[in-house]
């Protein structure tokens, strides 16, 4: 848990984030790139899924995760709610606010980024989380929606729909105090600086924190 009014942010692989305050634990996007121990977590107050793609929700292992956290609020976009057949999921939408413990979760946006025009855009609802006076934004798979007042931005760094210039522009538009990378297991170690260094050099964030797949940081 975080202490002294800080928020603890832990990466758990690719797009999965565990956000903790003294009172509340929120897990976001437990997908196929996560190790098995992520799906054995307990004591969660909320489980959030931004969209249906398997790198954001591993349906097979997610069943055990939800069963291990029977009191957790489970939030997801409307299309994912129609697809999952385990647990009780609450639909998250753009602008909808949900309070869990000392955390307020607000839905941001509605559609996934375009991968190729021939593919339909699935639903995608990012989350702006207010905790301990800090606002944390995780957009899911899109750069389209830019909320105001973001302290910490978890920026998707690499995917079939991303482009480095658009990543940099998105960070510039959000203008966070701190930026950290997520959605990056599609990038090789050798190529990683080609993406992350551009965010550092050109994104304009106050601070850039490079977290490994199992690393944590604390934000006052």
Where does each model-flagged region fall?
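Active-site metal-binding motif and surrounding structural segment of the metallo-beta-lactamase
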Residues: 32-76, 151-154, 175
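A short, conserved beta-to-alpha structural element at the edge of catalytic cores
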Residues: 82-84, 162-175
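A short helix->loop->beta-strand "cap" motif at the edges of active sites that frequently abuts
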Residues: 24, 68-73, 174-178, 204-206
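Core dinuclear metal-dependent hydrolase active-site scaffold
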Residues: 1-42, 89-149, 161-166, 212-220
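Catalytic metal-binding/acid-base residues of hydrolase active sites
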Residues: 53, 80, 111, 143, ...
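Hydrophobic/aromatic beta-strand patches that form the interior of the parallel beta-sheet core
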Residues: 10, 46-48, 75, 90, ...
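Short internal beta-strands
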Residues: 71-79, 178-185
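Binuclear metal-ion centers of metallo-dependent hydrolases, dominated by the metallo-beta-lactamase
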Residues: 10, 85-99, 168, 178-220
């Amino acid at each position: 848990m975080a202490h002294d009014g800080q928020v603890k942010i832990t990466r758990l692989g690719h797009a999965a984030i565990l956000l903790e305050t003294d009172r509340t634990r929120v897990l976001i996007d437990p997908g196929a790139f996560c190790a098995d121990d992520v799906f054995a977590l307990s004591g969660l107050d909320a489980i959030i899924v931004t969209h249906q793609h398997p790198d954001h929700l591993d349906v097979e292992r997610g069943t055990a995760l939800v069963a291990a956290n029977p009191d957790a609020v489970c939030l997801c976009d409307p299309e994912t709610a129609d697809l999952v057949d385990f647990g009780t999921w609450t639909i998250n939408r753009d602008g909808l606010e949900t309070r869990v413990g000392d955390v307020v979760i607000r839905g941001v946006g509605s559609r996934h980024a375009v991968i190729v025009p021939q593919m339909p855009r699935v639903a995608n609802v990012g989350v702006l989380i207010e905790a301990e006076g800090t606002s944390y934004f995780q957009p899911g798979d899109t750069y389209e929606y830019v909320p105001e007042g973001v302290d910490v931005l978890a920026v998707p760094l690499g995917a079939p729909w991303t482009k480095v210039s658009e990543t940099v522009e998105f960070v510039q538009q959000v203008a966070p105090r701190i930026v950290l990378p997520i959605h990056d297991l599609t990038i090789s170690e050798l190529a990683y600086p080609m993406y992350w260094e551009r965010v550092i050099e050109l994104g304009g964030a106050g601070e850039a924190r490079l977290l490994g797949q199992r690393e944590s940081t604390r934000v006052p």
